[in-house]
Amino acid sequence: MPSISINIILAFAAALLGMLMFRSHMMSSLLCLEGMMLSMFILSTLIISNTQLTMSFMMPIMLLVFSACEAAIGLALLVMVSNTYGLDYIQNLNLLKC
């Protein structure tokens, strides 16, 4: 396995670990989620370019589109929660409080 693939897998693992450790604030969770999506995009692009699979060249672009949609929805939710409660704690998103 090339060293760049190992580095990208380690970046994904670090973002996943950050997602598990810093889950109290919504902004840090969104940043870790974006890091995970970026490392998945780079790894899938490298794998597809190394294997010369012509049928799956669209997969990284579709992953990037879904990542952009996820980021837009996450930022809209962050703005809504911070305007409503004044904080970006994830505990504010509990639906059982209603």
Curated annotation (Swiss-Prot):
Query: What is its EC class?
Result: translocase
Keywords linked to the UniProt accession:
Electron transport, Membrane, Mitochondrion, Mitochondrion inner membrane, NAD, Respiratory chain, Translocase, Transmembrane, Transmembrane helix, Transport, Ubiquinone
Q: Looking at the keywords, is GTP-binding present?
A: no
A Pfam family of this chain: Oxidored_q2
Task: Give me the reactions it catalyses.
Answer: a ubiquinone + NADH + 5 H(+)(in) = a ubiquinol + NAD(+) + 4 H(+)(out)
Q: Listed GO molecular functions?
A: NADH dehydrogenase (ubiquinone) activity
Residue stretches spanning the membrane: 2-22, 28-48, 61-81
Q: Which GO terms describe its cellular component?
A: mitochondrial inner membrane; respiratory chain complex I
Q: What topology in the membrane does the UniProt record assign?
A: Multi-pass membrane protein
Q: Which GO terms describe its biological process?
A: ATP synthesis coupled electron transport
- Which Cys-Cys disulfides exist here? none
Protein EC: 7.1.1.2
Q: Where in the cell is it found?
A: Mitochondrion inner membrane
Task: Classify the main location.
Answer: mitochondrion
- Function statement: Core subunit of the mitochondrial membrane respiratory chain NADH dehydrogenase (Complex I) which catalyzes electron transfer from NADH through the respiratory chain, using ubiquinone as an electron acceptor. Part of the enzyme membrane arm which is embedded in the lipid bilayer and involved in proton translocation.
> What PANTHER family does the entry give?
NADH-UBIQUINONE OXIDOREDUCTASE CHAIN 4L (PTHR11434:SF0), NADH-UBIQUINONE OXIDOREDUCTASE SUBUNIT ND4L (PTHR11434)
Which family is this protein grouped under?
Belongs to the complex I subunit 4L family.
Q: How does it assemble?
A: Core subunit of respiratory chain NADH dehydrogenase (Complex I) which is composed of 45 different subunits.
Name by which UniProt lists this protein: NADH-ubiquinone oxidoreductase chain 4L
This chain's source organism reads: Allocebus trichotis (Hairy-eared dwarf lemur)
